Structure formats: C-alpha cells, structure tokens
A protein has these predicted regions:
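N-terminal export/targeting and maturation segments
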Residues: 21-70
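Extracytoplasmic cysteine-anchoring/structural motifs
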Residues: 21-29, 33-34, 38, 71-188
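C-terminal motif of bacterial Sec signal peptides marking the signal peptidase cleavage site
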Residues: 16-19
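Bacterial N-terminal signal peptides that target proteins for export
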Residues: 1-8
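Surface-exposed loop/turn and secondary-structure junction residues enriched for glycine/proline
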Residues: 4, 50-51, 163
Length: 188
C-alpha cells in the first residue's frame, strides 16, 4: 500500500511538473477601439434613457464609411475564442452598471491592432445637426514582443480627454440651441 501511494504521488508530481512549461506562445488581447458616449441635457437628464420623455434615441444615427447605423438595443454575441477578436456591432444602446450615467451609446468595435491615421464617425443629431467624431490609432509591437497602442478621439477637430483612460468613453451635453458639447469627466 505504501508503495502504491509513493507511485501515485510520483506520477502526480511528474504530471504537474510537465504542465508547467514556460515556452508557450503568448497571445496578446489588444483592447479594441470602441466609442462610448453618454448624453445629458443642461439639467442632467439622461437623453438616452427611454423612460425620459425628451430622449433622443429615435432621432440619433451614426454615419461611418458610407453606411448609416440607427440605434439598436440588442447585439449578436459571438462565440468566445482563446484570443479576443473585436466584433463590429454598429450603434448600440446599452445600460451600464458601472458608469455615472445609466444609458450610453457604443459604436464599434474596431481592431486595436491597426495603425489608423484618422477616421470620421458622424453623429447625426435631431434638427439635422451633426457632430463629427473621429479617432486615430497607432499600434506597434515593441522589441520585447509586447504591444504598444495609443488611441485618440476628436469632436469637431478638437482632441478629447478620455474620461476613463484610453477607452473611448465620453460625456456630452446636448441642447437644441447649442448642439453637442463635450463635458470633461462627466461633470456639468
């Protein structure tokens, strides 16, 4: 019996040792480019909340590369893979549990592994107004094999300061008189 325990312990140790190889390929999940926006009025009402009487949901579309995308409330989920692959969902209204505002619009996702000079995204607002959002992305692999990525977003040609650290999350205020105005850090 003692010999059997020793044999099993030895085989288990051998299996654990063999499973601890350091020569596996590293698969880097590069964060995708995704624009997320929150829109309020001057009084702080969430203009993307369907329960708010003056919401903008039905009046918003996005034009991108000769296509127009209306606001959708559901998206198709793709099968998980070992490496994260970005999936383009179009313009999605979603409820956020971790954001200062309850509802937001997400447009994307785009591959973060491409260097892009500048691409425009036109947000079509009520009354025929438009806000020109744009992004540029630089990406390269460092000599040690790690990815280096930098994404910058713009509103009407002005660079936006990312509210949550390079993830494309921005807060705006909308009025019929002034159009869309950027609100740094989601403050009024």
């Amino acid at each position: 019996m003692k010999r059997l325990k020793e044999t099993i312990t030895m085989m288990l140790a051998l299996c654990l040792y063999a499973a601890c190889g350091n020569n596996e390929d590293i698969i880097w999940d590069v964060y995708p480019i995704n624009l997320e926006i929150f829109i309020t009025d001057s009084e702080g009402h969430d203009l993307l909340d369907s329960t708010f009487q003056d919401n903008l949901i039905k009046d918003l579309t996005v034009s991108y590369q000769d296509e127009t995308y209306p606001v959708a409330t559901e998206r198709e989920y793709y099968k998980n893979t070992r490496a994260y692959m970005p999936h383009f969902y179009g313009l999605i209204l979603r409820q956020n549990w971790n954001a200062p505002r309850n509802f937001g619009l997400a447009f994307g996702e785009f591959s973060g592994e491409e260097s892009i000079d500048k691409r425009e995204i036109t947000l079509n607002l009520p009354d025929g107004r438009q806000a020109i959002l744009a992004y540029k992305n630089s990406f390269k692999w460092k000599s040690n094999g790690e990815p280096k990525k930098n994404t910058v977003f713009y509103l009407d040609g002005q660079e936006l300061k990312d509210d949550y650290g390079k993830h494309g999350i921005y807060h705006f205020q909308y009025s019929h008189n002034q159009g869309l105005k950027y609100i740094p850090n989601g403050t009024k």
